[in-house]
């Protein structure tokens, strides 16, 4: 993370992830899951883990009394991972009150099943959207609950893109916790349609990160980062588009394309 702020990420040849991406997303990051070799065993482990955590923790620690309600909410949230969370949409889909949805979302955050990413608020710009994004805590868990395998995931590019962004956010949260300076993970979106997947913030200094499910990148992909650079002003340190390539490429002033493997492996 500190290298991202200093624009000092090592310039070298990185490895392509390519066809390894789908299996990587399906496997997720839990140590017990990483050790599983059989896809069916992997899915079973994730489902058992999910059931154990939600039923035990909801009943005995959170004392909410209804683990099935939490299960239903989490399944829908996992399907919307990386998106702005529409609480009213969840409430309508499940027939729950808005208050109940908010209570169970807070519970899912306490159980570390969901990561809440707040919105970045530029000091001099008022057209930003304040809604947070929510990410599944682990791509393997989210995909196991929907029975995705390697073949079906490759056929759903939109889902792969969502899960890739979620995996990047998970990794950045880990790196941020070890950074030399206190670092928060936020996101940016405004009413003009510009958005940045991740905004790393150290004090007032910010770095923008976009995640792209592609092996190529161009300066036109940097429109969100350029808007962030404008609204953040002198606080903007650098912007990166993560892509499945081999080299770091400068696209614009303080904006670079950076291989995914620099973050994920």
For the regions a protein language model found, what residue spans apply to each?
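Short beta-strand/turn micro-motifs composed of small residues
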Residues: 189, 212, 242-243
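Accessory nucleic acid-recognition modules appended to NTPase machines
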Residues: 34-206
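Active-site-adjacent loop/helix micro-motif of nuclease/hydrolase catalytic cores
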Residues: 215-225
């Amino acid at each position: 993370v500190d290298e991202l702020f200093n624009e000092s990420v090592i310039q070298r040849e990185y490895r392509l992830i390519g066809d390894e991406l789908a299996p990587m997303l399906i496997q997720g990051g839990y140590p017990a899951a990483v050790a599983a070799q059989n896809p069916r065993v992997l899915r079973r482990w994730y489902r058992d883990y999910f059931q154990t955590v939600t039923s035990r923790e909801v009943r005995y620690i959170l004392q909410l009394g209804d683990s099935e309600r939490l299960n239903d909410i989490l399944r829908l949230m996992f399907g919307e991972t990386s998106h702005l969370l529409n609480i009213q949409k969840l409430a309508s889909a499940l027939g729950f009150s808005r208050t109940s949805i908010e209570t169970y979302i807070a519970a899912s955050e306490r159980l570390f099943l969901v990561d809440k990413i707040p919105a970045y608020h530029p000091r001099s710009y008022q057209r930003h959207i304040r809604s947070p994004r929510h990410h599944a805590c682990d791509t393997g868990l989210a995909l196991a609950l929907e029975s995705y395998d390697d073949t079906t995931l490759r056929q759903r590019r939109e889902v792969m893109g969502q899960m890739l962004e979620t995996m990047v956010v998970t990794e950045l949260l880990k790196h941020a916790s070890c950074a030399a300076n206190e670092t928060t993970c936020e996101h940016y979106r405004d009413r003009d349609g510009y958005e940045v997947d991740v905004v790393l913030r150290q004090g007032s200094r910010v770095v923008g990160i976009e995640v792209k499910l592609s092996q190529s990148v161009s300066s036109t992909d940097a429109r969100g980062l350029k808007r962030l650079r404008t609204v953040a002003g002198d606080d903007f340190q650098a912007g990166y588009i993560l892509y499945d390539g081999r080299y770091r490429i400068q696209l614009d002033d303080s904006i670079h394309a950076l291989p995914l493997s620099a973050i994920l492996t």
